[in-house]
Curated annotation (Swiss-Prot):
Its main location: cytoplasm. The lineage of its organism: Bacteria, Pseudomonadati, Pseudomonadota, Gammaproteobacteria, Lysobacterales. This is Ribosomal RNA small subunit methyltransferase H. Pfam families: Methyltransf_5. It comes from Xanthomonas oryzae pv. oryzae (strain KACC10331 / KXO85). The gene is rsmH. It is an enzyme of class 2 (transferase). One of its GO terms (cellular component) is cytoplasm. It is found in: Cytoplasm.
Length: 337
């Protein structure tokens, strides 16, 4: 299998393409284009009748997509979050969907985007700079309780209250407008330890996730992806921290495995799976880590959408409607699951 261009090294490149099982005339959707590393790999396997849809909420990523693939009739480009992919594709029409979650390498590397605590820049953190509040705007008006809740919920930061109090105290003296200001402030109030991780890592992650509604988008996007897939279509998701991976793992398990039985409740309708787990957590090997250290925290999960047998349910895959495995289907809609 060919390798991606050296200028951009997408994580788990070979594993993603193997997981998607790209076919020559298939339809695929990359919901997080970034700089197009995975998308290039998909295109290499598509023939003239294949189709690739790419999405990204970052206008800079969309500009790269248009410059790189704008002349390719097989590619259609859409600006927006993958949470809205149902507005881009019809139900049960896609053979494979990739979601590569979190912040992209270019976003981290450009100081002006305000994502990095290692490079001073405006305290922004928005993946779509034309939408919503910047991190600086939110920190300027949030209460210490709200800040602490965000740091704990999205960063699992144990010192969330201490950091929140410090932010509120500092902004009373001067506005927090730069990433270096915030990173230095957090470092100054954190207990000294032997950790090799920068003391602002969890806080920056938490604020970024909150500002961009990343976990909300993920939950909505997973539901939309399942509806969009054809029977036999595959969903591949790369996550970079435990909060994301937990949501992905639980989503796939919910539609692939029967819920635990409860002897105190009436016997439930037979469970009919909607997904089949193709693999457990896939991580980068040593060879990839030597080339791309960012892959160290990456976790890939792949699942395949199943076709319901005749009689299992009248909610057929081609309708795109997703049966809830926790709820029985009324008898009027067909055989109970």
């Amino acid at each position: 299998m060919s390798q991606p261009p050296a200028a951009h090294v997408p994580v788990l490149y070979t594993q993603v393409l193997d997981g998607l099982q790209v076919t020559e005339n298939g339809t695929y959707l990359d919901g997080t284009f970034g700089r197009g590393g995975h998308a290039r790999g998909v295109l290499e396997h598509l023939g003239p009748g294949g189709r690739l849809l790419v999405m990204d909420k970052d206008p800079e990523a969309i500009a790269v997509a248009e410059q790189t693939f704008g002349g390719d009739a097989r590619v259609s480009i859409h600006r927006g979050s993958f949470a809205g992919l149902g507005q881009v594709v019809a139900a049960a029409t896609v053979d494979g969907i990739l979601l590569d979650l979190g912040v992209s390498s270019p976003q981290l590397e450009v100081a002006g985007r305000g994502f990095s605590f290692g490079k001073d820049g405006p305290l922004d953190m928005r993946m779509d700079p034309d939408s919503g509040q910047s991190a600086a705007q939110w920190l300027a008006q949030a209460t210490d309780r709200e800040i602490a809740d965000v740091l704990w919920t999205y960063g699992e930061e144990r010192q969330s209250r201490r950091i929140a109090r410090a932010i509120v105290a500092r902004r009373a003296e001067q506005p927090l407008l730069r990433t270096a200001q915030l990173a230095d402030l957090i470092a100054s109030v954190m207990p000294r330890g032997d950790s090799k991780t920068h003391p602002a890592t969890r806080s920056f992650q938490a604020i970024r996730i909150y500002i961009n509604r990343e976990l909300d988008d993920l939950e909505t996007g997973l539901d939309a992806a399942l509806a969009a897939l054809k029977p036999g279509g595959r969903l591949a998701v790369i996550s970079f921290h435990s909060l994301e991976d937990r949501i992905v793992k639980q989503f796939m398990a919910r539609y692939a495995k029967a819920p635990p039985s409860n002897r105190r409740l009436p016997e439930a309708q037979p469970f009919v799976p909607t997904l089949q787990l193709v693999s457990g957590a896939i991580k980068a090997d040593d060879a990839e880590l030597n080339v791309n250290p960012r892959a160290r925290s990456a976790v890939l999960r792949v699942a395949e959408k199943l076709e319901l047998r005749i009689g299992d349910s009248l909610l057929e895959r081609r309708s795109g409607r997703i049966p809830n495995p926790q709820s029985p289907i009324p008898a009027s809609q067909g055989d109970a699951r």
